[in-house]
């Protein structure tokens, strides 16, 4: 590829904010140079939702915008002036769009090189950034037409077929057999950890995924076997399905929900098991109970003898396959035994699975399925109010390292910690599992989204004051944030 260059500011067209880097700029057939992130990101009063990055900051969004404006490639440059002290690192761009192809070439170039390219114009990327950030004015322009960039990117995308594995147990009641209870779990994991590994130094080693999610997959197989051998067959039909592609986003469950083998509205409910093999202290997490009246009571009744300490959440959304059915307005229940330090690491191995408690979880799910099967009418879907969510900056992660693991149980205000990683900034400050974070850097924290955005506004080395509730006691500590690894 050989094409002329244009500078396109942050590469954002956002009519809702009355902002357009491409206004008056002809990018057709050209390579666009864009800054990372978005304008005024350190300004609480920015029209771009203050310090909370919007979806426009995502590299995938910038690439889509560049393509829509006719560009043939996009060069990304770090906006170092907004992030003093951050390393000028080149990003790994292979995961910015998940499994989707962007249909445009994206590379990153260091600011020092862009400085040389812009020198004839009398500008640098940082002084242009400052001018844009000052008043959101447009400073896009075409470079000298004689200046071309030739680039060769050698990418081989290998496509291999993968499949959901689906089984059907027909119901015996003629009036109910055309209604379906779905019991599912994802069977994929991370392979060698090239994407999403939380052990970057061990990328290339087998990430076993015993808990995530051989445990849930085993649960589906056990339930299929059990229900097919029960003396009394279910009245409703039961679909048992093991999904592929969950670790890339709930892609294959979404495909199933979009191309169901039966009318999707004939679904009674969808039950998802993801990581059910590491029950600790008899604690189990069940979410989705707000997606239909009576679901929480149904689970409580099913738990009467097993007596798990269940933490309920009403939300039907989450980072697993049940979300694909929530968006179709299907009642869902998600069973989860909690995060642990082996999550997304090679150390998630079978010797750490608690098979006894895992079997108890499967028994609980069996009881729930029987409870659903006993219903005379399909449960009514209820849309649960979700907190507002904004996008994250592509490649930006969640900012500096803090070290808490969230407890996904609902609390009235704040973020409850299910654990605190040993040696982390949070642990060094004396924070503990069970603490509820209510303030971070003197800013109120109502939910995990608040915490994510506030944390991302900081950088490694910052000293921040945090306040937690420990029982009824308010405790304030100073935490020194570190580099996320």
Task: Locate the predicted segments by residue.
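Soluble metallo-hydrolase cores and metallopeptidase-like ectodomains found primarily
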Residues: 1-24, 99-209, 222-225, 229-235, ...
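Protease-associated
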Residues: 1-64, 155-157, 170, 394-396, ...
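Metal-dependent peptidase/peptidase-like ectodomains
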Residues: 1, 23, 102-129, 232, ...
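C-terminal recognition in membrane/secretory proteostasis and scaffolding
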Residues: 346, 373-485
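Terminal peptide-recognition signature
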Residues: 6, 27, 66, 110, ...
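Acidic/histidine-rich catalytic neighborhood of metal-dependent amide-processing enzymes
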Residues: 50-55, 61, 82, 176, ...
């Amino acid at each position: 590829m050989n094409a002329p260059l244009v500078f396109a500011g942050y590469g954002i067209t956002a009519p809702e904010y009355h902002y357009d880097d491409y206004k008056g700029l002809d990018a057709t057939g050209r390579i666009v140079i864009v800054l990372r992130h978005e304008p005024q990101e350190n300004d609480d009063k920015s029209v771009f939702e203050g310090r909370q990055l919007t979806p426009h900051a995502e590299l995938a969004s910038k690439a889509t915008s560049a393509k829509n404006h006719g560009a043939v490639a996009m060069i990304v440059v770090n906006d170092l002036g907004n992030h003093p002290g951050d390393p000028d690192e080149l990003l790994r761009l292979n995961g910015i769009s998940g499994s989707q192809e962007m249909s445009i070439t994206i590379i990153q170039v260091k600011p020092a090189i862009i400085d040389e390219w812009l020198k004839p114009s009398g500008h640098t990327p940082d002084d242009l950034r400052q001018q844009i950030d000052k008043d959101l004015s447009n400073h896009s322009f075409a470079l000298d037409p004689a200046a071309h960039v030739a680039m060769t990117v050698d990418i081989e995308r290998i496509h291999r077929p993968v499949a959901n594995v689906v089984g059907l147990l027909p119901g015996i009641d003629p009036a109910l057999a055309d209604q379906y209870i779905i019991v599912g779990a994802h069977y994929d994991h991370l392979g060698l950890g090239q994407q999403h590994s939380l052990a970057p130094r061990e990328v290339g080693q087998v990430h076993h995924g015993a808990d995530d999610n051989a445990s849930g997959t085993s649960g589906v197989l056990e339930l299929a076997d059990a229900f097919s051998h029960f003396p009394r067959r279910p009245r409703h039909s039961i679909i048992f399905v093991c999904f592929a592609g969950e670790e890339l986003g709930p892609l294959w469950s979404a495909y199933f929900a979009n191309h169901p083998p039966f009318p999707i509205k004939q679904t009674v409910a969808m039950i998802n098991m993801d990581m059910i093999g590491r029950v600790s202290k008899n604690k189990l997490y069940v979410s989705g109970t707000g997606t239909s009246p009576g679901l929480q009571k149904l689970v409580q009744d099913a738990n009467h003898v097993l007596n798990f300490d269940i933490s309920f959440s009403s939300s039907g959304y989450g980072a697993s396959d049940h979300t694909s059915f929530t968006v179709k307005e299907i009642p869902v229940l998600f069973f989860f035994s909690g995060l642990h330090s082996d999550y997304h690491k090679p150390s998630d191995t079978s010797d750490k699975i608690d098979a006894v408690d895992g079997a108890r979880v499967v028994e609980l799910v069996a009881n729930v399925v029987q409870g659903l099967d006993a219903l005379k009418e399909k449960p009514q879907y209820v849309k649960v109010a979700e907190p507002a969510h904004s996008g994250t900056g592509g490649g930006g992660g969640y900012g500096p390292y803090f070290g808490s693991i969230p407890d996904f149980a609902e609390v009235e205000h704040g973020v409850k910690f299910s654990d605190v990683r040993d040696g982390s900034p949070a642990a060094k400050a004396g924070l503990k599992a069970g603490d509820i974070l209510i303030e971070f850097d003197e800013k109120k924290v109502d939910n995990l989204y608040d915490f994510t955005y506030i944390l991302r506004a900081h950088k490694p080395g910052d000293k921040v004051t945090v306040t937690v509730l420990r029982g009824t006691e308010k405790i304030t500590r100073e935490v020194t944030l570190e580099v996320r690894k």
